Design a protein with these regions (language model features):
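Membrane-interface helix-boundary motifs at transmembrane edges
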Residues: 59-68, 112-122, 167-180
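Hydrophobic core positions of alpha-helical segments in small-molecule transporters
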Residues: 11, 15, 42-43, 72, ...
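Hydrophobic/small/kink-forming positions within alpha-helical transmembrane segments
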Residues: 21, 25, 53, 74, ...
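Glycine-/small-residue-enriched transmembrane alpha-helix faces in small-molecule transporters
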Residues: 1-39, 128, 132-135, 144-171, ...
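Structural motif at transmembrane-helix junctions in multi-pass transporters
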Residues: 32-39, 83-99, 175-178
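Loop-to-transmembrane-helix transition segments
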Residues: 8-16, 60-83, 149-158
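Hydrophobic transmembrane alpha-helices of multi-pass small-molecule transport proteins
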Residues: 52, 122-140
Length: 186
């Protein structure tokens, strides 16, 4: 791999990590502006949806060719993102993020079940630590460790849904990235 490509890849990862880490700030700003509940998520995703309408029209032929598989994958990934965004509104940001980031646990299990991937001892240890972390968030030792509010449930569901969407993306690698991204919104 050449250095220029590696540097661009590193910058892309840095940028994506920064955007993902700051994702919650506009959601909370909308909430502080007086927009409540699901309306926060609706308004948050309305702007990119409006900007993507011309791209969706331009790619309509390819979206139709992708058929139900592409549409289902798009609905799952878009639904996961919507659940995640809404979970931030209904629970603490840290709880929402940590519960969403159980995605590797669900992804490992799905990879084993549907792709026959091996689960290494290191992966098992990391999954156990992640589950212990989740149980701690839910109050292990203080009360029965279950999600405490609708935002917690949405955080867990968003991570699970994202893992299913990621599995579908791996199974349908012939779809273009732009069509997959459009599936988030349409």
């Amino acid at each position: 791999m050449n250095t220029s490509f590696e540097n661009r890849a590193k910058l892309a990862c840095l940028y994506a990590g920064g955007v993902w880490g700051l994702f919650w700030i506009p959601l909370r700003a909308l909430e502080e502006a007086g927009i409540n509940g699901l309306w926060v998520t609706f308004v948050y995703f309305l702007v990119p949806t409006i900007f993507l309408i011309p791209v969706g029209i331009w790619r309509l032929k390819y979206l139709k060719l992708g058929g139900f598989n592409l549409q289902l994958t798009g609905m799952l990934s878009g639904g996961a993102l919507m659940l995640y965004a809404t979970s931030i509104v209904y629970t603490d940001v840290v709880r929402a993020m940590l519960l969403f980031y159980l995605t590797p646990v669900w992804g490992t299990i799905l990879g084993r079940l549907f792709l026959n991937e091996n689960i290494t001892p290191l992966r098992i240890i990391s999954m156990i630590i992640a589950i212990i972390g989740m149980l701690t968030i839910f109050g292990l030792g203080v009360k029965f460790p279950i999600p405490q509010n609708v935002g917690d449930w949405m955080g867990v569901a968003s991570g699970l849904m994202w893992a299913v969407a990621s599995l579908r993306i791996r199974l349908n690698q012939n779809a273009s990235a732009i069509d997959m991204a459009l599936g988030f919104f349409f």
